[in-house]
Amino acid sequence: MRHGMSGRKLNRDKSARKALFVSLANALLKHEQIKTTLPKAKDARPIVEKLITLGKRGDLHARRQAYAFLRDDKVVAKLFAVIGPRYKERQGGYCRVLKAGFRYGDCAPMAIIELVDRDLAAKGTDSGPTADKKADADEE
């Protein structure tokens, strides 16, 4: 019996699942709205909300905890400089998951996960390369 077991395995082992949620959290905090499958969105939501709560705290220990999970300086800087202060008065519920139909090909249920009071003017703008792309460019 599976009483009391929360979360989904998503057909991955533990390390692949952690990498998936790190990637989803980075993308959501960078772009403030992403499209993914419904189970991934439902599982990523509490992770991102805990990161935003760290951003609201704003102290050094919270910043180090966020960096230990995200591993991207620019996303952590945005989390603490922009996103954290934006939700200073809101007590939780920073993300919403909207159902977005089914994917053509495998009919997987899709969802849009977005930050609640996101910046609509920034939609579609790219906030620059990620840390991985920058490191690859420096090596070449």
Curated annotation (Swiss-Prot):
It comes from Paramagnetospirillum magneticum (strain ATCC 700264 / AMB-1) (Magnetospirillum magneticum). Keywords: Ribonucleoprotein, Ribosomal protein. Part of the 50S ribosomal subunit. Contacts protein L32. It comes from the Bacteria. Transmembrane segments: none annotated. Belongs to the bacterial ribosomal protein bL17 family. GO terms for cellular component: cytosolic large ribosomal subunit. GO terms for biological process: translation. GO terms for molecular function: structural constituent of ribosome. PANTHER family: LARGE RIBOSOMAL SUBUNIT PROTEIN BL17M (PTHR14413:SF16), RIBOSOMAL PROTEIN L17 (PTHR14413). The gene is rplQ. Disulfide bonds: none annotated. This is Large ribosomal subunit protein bL17.
